[in-house]
Amino acid sequence: MKSITRRFARLCALQALYAWQLSKNDYTMISNYVIKIQNIQNFNISYFLTLYIGVIHTIKELNTLMIPYLSRGLKAIDYIEYSVLLIALFELTQCCDVPYKVVINEAIELAKIFGSEKSHKFINGVLDKIITEKLYKG
């Protein structure tokens, strides 16, 4: 059950980050709206907020980590791919209870559902490089 509720929390965090980037609205307004419309018993609000607010508060650090491993500039990445990468990098660096293989798998699944045809390959490539070269050397 934990994996299902966390998966849904990731999905909601992705949607909230996407809305935040496009609308430039106050991030708390967006999180409140997401919580209000998700009238689902298994919605892990705590994990959603951890991801969503955590990404927003650490976005500069996450960008710094991500940029050297991108095959194109940050502004050339669409909002979905960017949001998926931000969530995954936040989980990799801040959520020690989530194995990195789970983070990669969840990011790829989100990219397959919401991204373009090749988004999941791009996400996998970037995360693989960051994990092997930066986060989990040796």
Curated annotation (Swiss-Prot):
GO biological process, one term: DNA-templated transcription termination
Listed Pfam families: NusB (PF01029)
Listed GO CC annotations: cytosol
Keyword Nucleotide-binding in record: no
Alphabetized UniProt keyword annotations: RNA-binding, Transcription, Transcription antitermination, Transcription regulation
A GO molecular-function descriptor: RNA binding
Top-rank taxon: Bacteria
Function: Involved in transcription antitermination. Required for transcription of ribosomal RNA (rRNA) genes. Binds specifically to the boxA antiterminator sequence of the ribosomal RNA (rrn) operons.
Protein family per UniProt: Belongs to the NusB family.
Annotated PANTHER family: ANTITERMINATION NUSB DOMAIN-CONTAINING PROTEIN (PTHR11078:SF3), N UTILIZATION SUBSTANCE PROTEIN B-RELATED (PTHR11078)
Protein name: Transcription antitermination protein NusB
Gene: nusB
